A protein has these predicted regions:
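A short, internal acetyl-CoA/4′-phosphopantetheine-binding micro-motif in the GNAT/acyltransferase core
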Residues: 75-82, 107
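Conserved beta-strand in the GNAT
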Residues: 50, 55-76
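Recognition helices and adjacent regulatory flanks at domain boundaries
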Residues: 29-39, 51, 86
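Conserved GNAT acetyl-CoA-binding A-motif
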Residues: 97-113
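A short helix-loop-beta-strand connector motif used in the catalytic cores of GNAT acetyltransferases and
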Residues: 39-50, 71
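Short amphipathic alpha-helix that is part of the acyltransferase structural core
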Residues: 1-36
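Conserved acetyl-CoA pyrophosphate-binding loop and the N-cap/start of the following alpha-helix
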Residues: 81-93
Length: 114
């Protein structure tokens, strides 16, 4: 079973590896600038989490919690660990917290999306 640790500031010991995965996994136009990252981390409805499998970092999630539903803004699995079911496990655990959850997926319609 995956475990997760909440990251509440850029000073967190896990922030650097999360930020590196974030930069690799999402196109530049979907990424927050540094100040916007700090603001999101301080928002009470936002949760940035580092996910681990037996101590090995496997991915990240950035979720918002609202009255009655959750919204997954970012979800990424380390590129060296993809196709091993981690995304499915991570998503399943998030859904136990908020069964009604929105996961936005951008269609692969541009060269940058591919």
């Amino acid at each position: 079973m995956l475990t997760c640790e909440s990251v509440r500031s850029t000073d967190s010991p896990h922030f650097a590896m999360l930020d590196a995965l974030y930069a690799r996994a999402f196109p530049w136009h979907e990424q927050r600038e540094s100040e916007a990252k700090r603001q999101a981390l301080s928002h009470p409805r936002y949760a940035l989490e580092a996910w681990f499998d037996e101590g090995v970092f496997v991915g990240l999630s950035g979720c918002w919690q609202f009255a009655g539903y959750g919204y997954i803004e970012h979800l990424a699995i380390d590129d060296t660990l993809r196709s091993r079911g981690y995304g499915k496990q991570l998503l399943a655990q998030i859904l136990t917290r908020a069964p009604l959850t929105i996961l936005e997926i951008d269609p692969l319609t541009t060269a940058i999306a591919h």
